[in-house]
């Protein structure tokens, strides 16, 4: 509550809470996803997994959904904060629910990046490091400073594509209650 100036703002909402999610997920989600496939390759159990009577698509979707369920359970552990805000004031609960939905979607996006990178390496530390760098790049791609670096030599259409990769720009509208 103190880190996001929750009490000083004088508003009953969770916007400061959701402001930290992209940066927190940039570290936590690669840690969750680093073992999804790299450990299977390192230990040699990938052959066993691929010879089971399930399709590769089912295995990929199953691992992704299991990791996403873990992130969902971890995020649901923050529901008491929502109850605290409702006790202290009268927030717009639909905006808070939209923030939670956006947070889950962002976790899914980061998980898909991490799972893809984990499948490309058999070392967990390498998978974590590359996933962190890619997620960091996706977070920064919508910042005006980054876009200004590209604006002098790239067309506007390319800048819009670069900006569309940003998790932050999409999450900004969702955490304010706008789902588009």
What are these model-derived regions, one by one?
Residues 1-39, 64:
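Hydrophobic alpha-helical transmembrane segments
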Residues 1-3, 11, 24, 65-125:
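Secretory targeting signals
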Residues 6-7, 11, 130-179:
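Terminal transmembrane helical anchor/hairpin motif
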Residues 7-8, 41, 45, 85-93, ...:
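Membrane-interfacial segments
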Residues 28, 32, 76-80, 112, ...:
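Transmembrane alpha-helix boundary/anchor motif
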Residues 36-66:
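Helix-loop-helix units of permease transmembrane domains in multi-pass membrane transporters
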Residues 53, 120-121, 178:
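Helix-loop interface residues and adjacent transmembrane-helix termini in multi-pass membrane transporters
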Residues 59, 127-128:
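Alpha-helical transmembrane segments and their helix-entry boundary regions
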């Amino acid at each position: 509550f103190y880190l996001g100036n929750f009490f000083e703002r004088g508003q009953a909402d969770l916007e400061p809470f959701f402001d930290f999610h992209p940066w927190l997920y940039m570290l936590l989600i690669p840690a969750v996803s680093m073992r999804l496939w790299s450990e299977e390759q390192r230990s040699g159990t990938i052959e066993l997994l691929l010879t089971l009577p399930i399709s590769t698509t089912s295995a990929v979707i199953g691992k992704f959904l299991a990791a996403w369920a873990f992130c969902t359970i971890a995020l649901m552990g923050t529901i008491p904060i929502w109850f605290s805000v409702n006790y202290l004031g009268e927030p717009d609960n639909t905006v808070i629910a939209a923030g939670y939905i956006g947070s889950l979607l962002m976790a899914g996006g980061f998980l898909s990046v991490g799972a893809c990178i984990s499948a490309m390496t058999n070392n967990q530390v390498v998978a974590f490091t590359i996933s962190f760098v890619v997620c960091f790049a996706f977070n920064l791609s919508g910042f005006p400073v980054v876009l200004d670096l590209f604006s002098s030599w790239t067309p506007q259409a390319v800048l819009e594509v670069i900006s569309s990769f940003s998790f932050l720009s999409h999450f900004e509208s969702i955490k304010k209650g706008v789902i588009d």
